[in-house]
Amino acid sequence: MIFDGFIKNLIYDPVSTLGILIFYFLLINLPISLLALFNKKSSSFVRFFTILINLFIALQLIFRWILSGHFPISNLYESLYFLVWGISLGQLLVEKEYPNPIIPVIAIPIELLTIAFACFVLPDDLKLSSNLVPALRSSWLIMHVSVVMLSYAALIIGSLLSASVLFINNRQPLQLRSSSTGIGGFRMSNEYSGNNFNEPINFTHTEELDTLSYRSILVGFVLLTLGLITGAIWANEAWGTWWSWDPKETWAFISWLFYAAYLHMRISRGWQGRRPALFATSGFFVVLICYLGVNFLGIGLHSYGWIFGILN
């Protein structure tokens, strides 16, 4: 009966049904990822569910594309799922480079909260697909928005990896060992003598985590740069101006400056130890404000107007 009901819902409303299913997969994957900290065998289940989640999000977005007739990243609901798709893909790529159970532990809660927000918090009118306004009926929609969302995913992963470095090395003095190209990272001046309970996490390998954080942020920065360039070209094509200091544009530029400062610090080695890690970690909130905070104020060309809609 339950399976029959699921099939009916999947046929009637595949987008919402798959969205709920993705939420439950993440809900299952979270405790398994925590268990993997102490049991390496659980890591294979975490990767399996992460791959499944990534594929189901892709399938959901494909259904949305078919039903709406346009690329499924034109509203907040769609972009939230696209963001989680990007984060989960980045999680898998990072784990392939450095298979450490701490990586899904920091990524999955963000993915779960994002999907929960999309499923249960967003008003129904923001979940519905609608016809695009003339300015959005452009190939730049795919080129600009998808690149920006992938940049957010990469920057979030990089910031969370920096947070994990700080968490793992709590109360441990850190020293920056990276070269000007960012190869290397933090190392503890006094090696950590681990114990059997925490054995699956190699606490002396935070250098690799920091290196992956740097590389993720570098990828995100490059994508954000491309996003700003394509956005300016699209704006000129749609509205006749390259830059209008729209709140979203302004915060995207602030985010770009923020991470440019971080990369400058890493390349020049002007800062050492915890300070660049703290700087990168705080970047998570910069991205959060740029992506959600500005939009919800209901101001500018990029806004969704949710908060103002409630207040009115």
Curated annotation (Swiss-Prot):
As for subcellular location, the record says:
Cellular thylakoid membrane
Identify the GO cellular component terms for this protein.
plasma membrane-derived thylakoid membrane
Query: InterPro entries, alphabetically?
Result: Cyt_c_assembly (IPR002541), Cyt_c_biogenesis_CcsA (IPR017562), Cyt_c_biogenesis_CcsA/CcmC (IPR045062)
* GO biological process annotation, one example: cytochrome complex assembly
UniProt keywords (A-Z) are: Cytochrome c-type biogenesis, Membrane, Thylakoid, Transmembrane, Transmembrane helix
Superkingdom, natural source: Bacteria
So where does this one cross the membrane? 18-38, 48-68, 73-93, 102-122, 148-168, 216-236, 250-267, 279-299
**Gene Ontology molecular function, alphabetical:** heme binding
Topology relative to the lipid bilayer, per the entry, is: Multi-pass membrane protein
Describe, as the record does, how this protein assembles with itself and its partners: May interact with ccs1.
Please give the HAMAP family that the UniProt record associates with this protein: CytC_CcsA (MF_01391)
Q: Which family does it belong to?
A: Belongs to the CcmF/CycK/Ccl1/NrfE/CcsA family.
* Task performed by this protein: Required during biogenesis of c-type cytochromes (cytochrome c6 and cytochrome f) at the step of heme attachment.
Name-wise, this protein is Cytochrome c biogenesis protein CcsA
Gene name of this polypeptide: ccsA
